[in-house]
């Protein structure tokens, strides 16, 4: 146990040493405002590249919320990611400071948006003819591959809303899917708001098969894919929104391969139009 504590202490000492060597001083980086899911946030970053990362979402509107990132925030974010890796049985790794800053901003905004009935969910979301379809599941199940097949199938009719972590706003009339800068390794997102027509839980399969499932059958899978805050009150709100989401949007379960026919099968079922 003592050795583990010493290793943790050494890792965080190294983290702060690297941070002070390479961090751009905060007073030298201009603040900016961006709009995510209808929320305008003023961001005071540590790194110049953060503004560029968020460029499609920049706005001149008056901010309603503010995020200022510190060195302590980056260390805390690293510890959160390490805990997630341990929980999922993955290898612990050190993330770059700019990445940790972006993740910190994302987490703060996601937590704040819960009060506006908006939750962030891990999944790849594509829109076709003005309706959005979200594909979710554990890492490695082929979410990005599946939405790429949709784009190949529909061409200009398909718009990539977000390839990794879209925001979903629950309203009295349905659910709206929003793009965001946090869009995975491929950086595929569009600053749009589109009605969500369905959520599909993907699994790898040899043959393509999709079926509708009930909210009761899908809710546990949905819980595992939503953004889970650190604060317990926020956690309860996130779980409550997941319950609402399951009752507002059709849920599907699919086993699929990587052939173009997989996109045809999922679209035909979720849209109700056979192609």
Where are these regions (language model features)?
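Extreme N-terminal, non-catalytic leader segments
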Residues: 77-129
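Conserved lysine of the Walker
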Residues: 143
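Glycine-rich, often acidic-flanked micro-motifs
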Residues: 24-28, 37-52, 64, 95, ...
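Short, intrinsically disordered, mixed-charge
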Residues: 59, 110, 114, 152-156
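Post-Walker A alpha-helix
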Residues: 146-147
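N-terminal amphipathic/hydrophobic targeting modules at extreme N-termini
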Residues: 6-8, 12-17
């Amino acid at each position: 146990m003592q050795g583990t504590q010493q290793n943790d202490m050494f890792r965080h000492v190294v983290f702060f040493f690297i941070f002070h060597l390479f961090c751009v001083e905060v007073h030298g980086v201009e603040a900016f405002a961006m709009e995510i899911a209808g929320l305008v946030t003023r961001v005071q970053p540590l790194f110049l590249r953060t503004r560029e990362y968020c460029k499609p979402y920049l706005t001149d509107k008056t901010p309603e919320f503010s995020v200022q990132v510190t060195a302590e925030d980056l260390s805390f974010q690293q510890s959160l990611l390490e805990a997630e890796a341990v929980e999922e049985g993955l290898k612990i790794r050190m993330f770059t400071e700019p990445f940790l800053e972006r993740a910190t901003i994302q987490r703060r905004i996601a937590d704040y948006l819960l009060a506006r009935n908006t939750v962030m969910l891990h999944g790849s979301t594509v829109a076709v003819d003005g309706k959005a379809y979200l594909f979710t599941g554990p890492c490695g199940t082929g979410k990005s591959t599946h939405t790429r097949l949709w784009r190949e199938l529909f061409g200009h009719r398909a718009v990539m809303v977000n390839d990794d972590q879209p925001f979903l706003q629950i309203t009295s009339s349905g659910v709206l899917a929003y793009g965001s800068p946090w869009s995975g390794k491929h950086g595929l997102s569009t600053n749009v708001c589109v009605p969500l027509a369905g959520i599909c839980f993907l699994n790898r399969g040899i043959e393509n098969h999709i079926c509708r499932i009930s909210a009761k059958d899908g809710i546990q899978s949905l819980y595992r894919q939503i953004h889970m805050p650190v604060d317990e009150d926020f956690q309860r709100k996130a779980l409550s929104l997941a319950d609402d989401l399951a009752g507002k949007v059709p849920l599907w379960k699919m086993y699929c391969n990587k052939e173009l026919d997989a996109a045809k099968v999922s679209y035909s079922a979720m849209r109700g139009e056979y192609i």
